[in-house]
Amino acid sequence: GNIMAKQTTRAGMDVKEKMYLVLVLCFAAVLITVGAAFFIVRGLGSTTRQNDNTADSAATQEPLVADSSYDKNQNTIDTNKYSSTILEESADAGQSYVDETLFLGDSNTARMYRIFNYCSYDNAIGSVGMSGKSLATYACVQFQGYSGYKTMPEAVALMQPRRVILTFGTNDLSSSYSASSFASDYAKGIKAVQDAYPSVDIIVNAIPPLGQQHSNQNLTQTQVDEYNKALVQMCQDNGWKFLNSAEVLKDSSTGYAKSGYVLSSDGIHLTEQAMDALFTYIRTH
C-alpha cells in the first residue's frame, strides 16, 4: 500500500511556525482554461477560515452537455502491468497520515480545506484554475516573513512534508493537448518539487471523473481517462507512486462520476460525499 511512510515516523511539518496563511491567487478564476464554470471560493484571501457549506456552489456559465460516444473501457489502466506503481489497498493509516501529507492541486484541492474540513491551510495548497503544466513556474503561495509569492515547489521546500499528493489535470484538458504532452509537462513540475525537497515522497493522484452532464463541452471523460493512463506510465518511468482514486469516484457501469459525487450545477467539482470517499481511499492506499 502506502510507501514506507506508514511504518516510519518523523517530526511533523513545523508549518504553523513557518506559515501564517497560504494565500492562493485567482480570486475568481476559471476551473477550466477553455471557458466556463466560474467557481468563487468564499472567504478567499481572508485571514480567518470560513466553514460555510453554503459556499459549495458554482455559477454555471453555459448549459450542461453530455459526452458523445464515450467508451468507458477504451482507456482502462492495466493494474497488473503497473502493480509496483499503483498504490495497493492497505490498513487505514488514520488521520496522522493525512496530517503529514501536503496536498497540492487546483480548485478541487482548494475545496478540501476551504469548503470542507478534510485538511487545512497547514497541509494543503489549492489554486483555482491551475494546470499541471504550470506547476514549476506559477507563483501562488505567500508566507509570512517572505516577500512576494512562491511557487508550489518553493512552498514544499519551506514546508518540508513527509509526502505530497498532487491532483492536477482538469484544467489541462483540451482537444489540442495530447495526453503524452500533458504527462511530459506535468513531470517537469513534479521534478521541480523533487529538486526543491529531495526527501519528499511523490504521489500523483488520478484526475477525478466528470459527471455525465458537465458544463464545458470541451471536456470529455475520454480525455480524462487518456490523461490518467498517461499519468500511470509517467509515474512508473520516474519512480513515483500513482493513487488510482478515480476507481472509487467512478460509477463502474457508466465510467462517469458516481451520482451525487460532482456538483449538479457544473458536473466538475467534487461534493462532500465524493471527498469523504476520496479521503477514505487516501488513508487506505
Predicted regions and their residues:
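N-terminal Lys/Arg-rich, disordered targeting/topogenic segments
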Residues: 1-20
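Hydrophobic membrane-insertion alpha-helices, especially the h-region
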Residues: 23-38
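N-terminal, intrinsically disordered, polar/charged segments of Gram-positive cell-envelope systems
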Residues: 42-100
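Conserved SGNH/GDSL esterase-like catalytic core that processes O-acyl groups on lipids
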Residues: 91, 95-184
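Alpha/beta-hydrolase-fold catalytic nucleophile elbow
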Residues: 167, 205-206
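Charged helix-capping and loop-helix junction motifs
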Residues: 179-189, 224-227
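A short helix->loop->beta-strand "cap" motif at the edges of active sites that frequently abuts
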Residues: 197-201
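Catalytic His-Asp segment of secreted/periplasmic serine-dependent ester chemistry enzymes
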Residues: 209-285
